[in-house]
Amino acid sequence: MVKVSFNSALAHKEAANKEEENSQVLILPPDAKEPEDVVVPAGHKRAWCWCMCFGLAFMLAGVILGGAYLYKYFAFQQGGVYFCGIKYIEDGLSLPESGAQLKSARYHTIEQNIQILEEEDVEFISVPVPEFADSDPADIVHDFHRRLTAYLDLSLDKCYVIPLNTSVVMPPKNFLELLINIKAGTYLPQSYLIHEQMIVTDRIENVDQLGFFIYRLCRGKETYKLQRKEAMKGIQKREAVNCRKIRHFENRFAMETLICEQ
């Protein structure tokens, strides 16, 4: 018996292709380097590390400052705002005692918006344009933590700063109790008017040193220091100087603040 076998042409072709693949060689240029031979200089690594450290430090500082600002901003926004007023007698040293005198007395009214932040020890007063009195609208900040008072005369768009007078300005907690009583109707104040006179002195260049709340009030405004004259009760003769008048209250009596330039 004779065994006959045939060689497949396709099998020969596949074997030839495998040999060609095995014989392929990667040819690199003479100046090329192997990937594992590439080394980053130490100076570049160090510079990159410093950049990362400074970047993280700036980001952390921004987060801290931004958080502090947002806390004060939202604390300011969340404080309750009261719209209150008191009646006062302008042409007398005290309230009349008899009923006849009480009816004939000429009462004036001060109305204003008030906001108190007890935790920060700050009072905000906004005096609108009065209907009949010849006084200026104003925004006032009493900062008990900084022991400063700031007046923003809205007619002049100027700021004035003076040490806080705690003898006439109620502390935030007591003032808040007074406002709650006024709102509840248990205390309807009928009071008198106190006069105080301030003299404009030096200009303040850096309002950022006056604390967050006064900075918020006075930034971008011309800001001046004030010097207080002794508070006077009743009608007083005044010198012929250029004065602006602000009527407000932060106690059981009304206050007329004269801001004068000599």
UniProtKB/Swiss-Prot annotation:
Its main location: Golgi. Residues 1-49 are cytoplasmic. One of its GO terms (cellular component) is endosome membrane. One of its GO terms (biological process) is negative regulation of amyloid precursor protein biosynthetic process. The keyword Magnesium does not apply. Keywords: Cell membrane, Disulfide bond, Endosome, Glycoprotein, Golgi apparatus, Membrane, Signal-anchor, Transmembrane, Transmembrane helix. PROSITE patterns: BRICHOS. InterPro entries: BRICHOS_dom (IPR007084), ITM2 (IPR040145). The keyword tRNA-binding does not apply. It is a single-pass type II membrane protein. Disulfide bonds join 159-218, 243-260. The chain crosses the membrane at residues 50-70. It comes from the Eukaryota. It holds the Pfam family BRICHOS. It is found in: Golgi apparatus membrane; Cell membrane; Endosome membrane. Expressed in areas of chondro-osteogenic transition and widely in the nervous system. Residues 132-226 form the BRICHOS domain. Glycans are attached at residue 165. One of its GO terms (molecular function) is amyloid-beta binding. Residues 71-262 are lumenal. Belongs to the ITM2 family. Plays a role in the induction of neurite outgrowth. Homodimer; disulfide-linked. This is Integral membrane protein 2B. The lineage of its organism: Eukaryota, Metazoa, Chordata, Craniata, Vertebrata. The gene is ITM2B.
